[in-house]
């Protein structure tokens, strides 16, 4: 018996000591039995039951009551309040907090917008136990007294970033600004794909000529960015530059921002590798209960201070590791470097002539002097043909370096927060930045209920069909990602590059629909005398709502789809084409669209899309069924349109999917497409994709489909569809929150 086998209870006391029962504390899960089972749990993360805050809690309201200056004073005092259980290097915790914040924010990747500092996920597994996050558990314990003091007025997620900002300010650096607004989560996020490897530092994520799997950003399991010793521990600076460029690009950083971030971060502090890594104990999630969530217990010497072991690399980068200056570039260019190994056996670089330049004090014994060191990834900033000139320019122009690092650091720590409108507090910089996806201010009074009725009638009189209007509104709104709060209908960027040319948006049809709606917009705006206007962003959504109402009426249901005006139209100058390119759907099961080589099934990609849209399983289900009934597939594909009355908002998709008179067979070896034939006659009735059939195959989704297929559920189906539709249309309306 391995301790996980089932033990049947007897008539005696069921709480047998030393015996593991099939409870929440043990036993096989469904995923253990069926590893390929569709994971719908990611649609129900962060449920209210997991949140300890009271009903109605508003973090934004709490931030308004926060004495920010008092908080910053307390953080500044903490920087030099060294604790015996984890002494501060050089008597200052600033560098440690910079690393904590960097590793909190640095998990962000552009491919799916997941990761980043929002939510404070560094507190939970797996991030709290990644090898690259070694000893950051101590950093979080050091700021706990401040979190305890200020309570709900500041989240862990905000505090971990602000601690680094204040730390840098106390070391002489002027930051660009800070936005509060990162709300804490209370459980690990299960939607983030960190990689398929089952060992720490595994790198099975590469194919071909070192092509990194999408959407991953880090080069190895358990690293934030790249291996500082070089690819797979090979100390090759030019090969390291390749990894750096790819990884930082997937964090939305260009070459200049990359150089600034690495050099700026390594201006502070030191690396820790005083002895053999064999002295280091297990990570926090594997540590014994008496350690109270702390990991990496070190048996080398005192285990702390001069005896600390974290990365295995050892030493400072600059002569003054707790002062903002140009010391990193002075050191990088001021020496010729030779390969060596740290006391822990890690590859790093040391000056060929250690007496040629200034040394740094020992981090815990000011009477001792130590030579600086560089990592393989640091030398890449000098030797790479693109990074090298940037580094040289920063070395010769410290003001440019300071500004570049301030801006890149602000971007790093705010990239997953969405538009500037979501930033809170008095430290938000005034400057508008292109990567924030800026929007213009609304002009004139908003349209009212009479205007809305008039515009609906005019749209429906244009001759545009229900599928055309629904598909356009969905295409506009469904770019939203709850991960990094980007995309959505506000801005009407569907009319701009690159969205207007995406294959999933049917460019030819889209151009016709937009031209027609622009005609309605122009006529309405031209007829106003009070400065009132309707934006195209609003009109696209309103047109979709009108189409849904018409489709519901055709099915016998009079409904009013909620609509709130207030969207604005962004310009092409406010839209970074490359930045928005990552939002292009390679798969959208709601439109039965699939054009990707990702190693995932169509149904897995549907669930992933639904999670990014913050949808629950019932919301995902009703939207797929409704959009099929509305005939809103890309390129008017008939797959999944299980109805003889397309364009009417019926529950026919569910009724016909669950009809046992239909037999389904695959029409391709990869089982991507299917045909449904009459069980008796063999006549072809329907065609479908995996996305369609999963609602009859997966037991949980079938249970939901059965609800919507019931004879008494037609009205409830329409109501549920309208509610889910409205939610998607308003996902980026942060002004309505």
From Swiss-Prot:
Crosslink (Tryptophyl-tyrosyl-methioninium (Tyr-Met) (with W-102)) position: 225-251
The keyword RNA-binding belongs to this UniProt entry's keyword annotation: no
A Pfam family assignment: peroxidase
Cross-link Tryptophyl-tyrosyl-methioninium (Trp-Tyr) (with M-251): residue positions: 102-225
UniProt keyword annotations, A-Z: Heme, Hydrogen peroxide, Iron, Metal-binding, Oxidoreductase, Peroxidase
GO CC terms, sorted: cytosol
Database matches in PROSITE patterns: PEROXIDASE_1 (PS00435), PEROXIDASE_2 (PS00436), PEROXIDASE_4 (PS50873)
Gene3D superfamilies associated with the record: 1.10.520.10, Peroxidase, domain 2
Manganese is among the record's keywords: no
EC category name: oxidoreductase
Molecular-function GO terms, alphabetical: catalase activity; heme binding; metal ion binding
Processing after translation: Formation of the three residue Trp-Tyr-Met cross-link is important for the catalase, but not the peroxidase activity of the enzyme.
EC number(s) per entry: 1.11.1.21
Binding-site positions, heme b: 266
Annotated catalysed reactions: H2O2 + AH2 = A + 2 H2O; 2 H2O2 = O2 + 2 H2O
Site, as annotated: Transition state stabilizer: 99
Superkingdom of this protein's organism: Bacteria
InterPro entries to which the protein is assigned, alphabetical: Catalase_peroxidase, Haem_peroxidase, Haem_peroxidase_sf, Peroxidases_AS, Peroxidases_heam-ligand_BS
Cofactor(s) this protein requires: heme b
Active site location: 103
Assembly behavior: Homodimer or homotetramer.
PANTHER family linked to this entry: CATALASE-PEROXIDASE, HYDROPEROXIDASE I, BIFUNCTIONAL CATALASE-PEROXIDASE
Family: Belongs to the peroxidase family. Peroxidase/catalase subfamily.
Job description of the protein: Bifunctional enzyme with both catalase and broad-spectrum peroxidase activity.
NCBIfam families: cat_per_HPI, PRK15061.1
Name this polypeptide is given: Catalase-peroxidase
Organism of provenance: Caulobacter sp. (strain K31)
